């Protein structure tokens, strides 16, 4: 059973109940997309929402007699706005017909990897142009089963904010130059990191780490598309799973200057979300590429 089902309101679902849900999706999908997969099979995505912008997608192959063979399913949560404008490369997972999006966003400082939602769109576009697809941007979202709400940081003065924005812009430029092989930029980034480490080491003697670090975005665990994040809450809504009636928070966060939405079961979130507070949690990153 998929560990992130609880993020969309299926915290106590049994295997029998899940099979019923999946069979209902196959019989009466709300959304159906069909294309040819990498081996020439009639590959299909069948989806149904259980709450606004979230639900379960079943992927598999249609046979010549119109019977459907399930390959796998996964819970999804659709983002609401474009997260990055960077070029996205697509890589196929080895074990099944699923894909990952990969991009280097200078805001994050790490390679961003996410689970691709619109696989049929990607395969159709790839077949149409008869070459590899490099998408320009993606709409990202995260599913979380472990999160908490933190108080906001003390507001900085306008002059300080302007300095911070200028420093961020300079760092992005250095990262871009370093990726192009500029040794001077690499050396500058290394020195910045050493200075930052020294500063944090001094401050952490008397301060809590979460009062020093405003936001962060870093890999979590052994899966390449899972991250530990800390970001400012921009807006949030409370939704309800129409099958289980479990409540789900949809939280839009700003994290390292990128914006994405996270869904989490209300029972898995410690604290009360409010605009201006911070969300801290571990997420499974998904995304739809812009074609």
Please name every model-derived segment:
Residues 112-114, 261-266:
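Short amphipathic beta-strand/extended segments with alternating polar/hydrophobic composition
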Residues 265-281:
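Short nucleic-acid-contacting surface segments enriched for D/E, G, S/T with interspersed K/R
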Residues 284-291:
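Short, Lys/Arg- and Gly-enriched loop/turn segments at beta-strand edges
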Residues 1-42:
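N-terminal alpha-helical "arm" segments
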Residues 36-221:
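Long, hydrophobic alpha/beta structural blocks
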Residues 220-232, 277:
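Short coil-to-beta-strand transition motifs
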Residues 218, 237-239, 267:
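Eukaryotic intrinsically disordered and solvent-exposed regulatory patches
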Residues 234-262:
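OB-fold (S1/OB) nucleic-acid-binding surfaces
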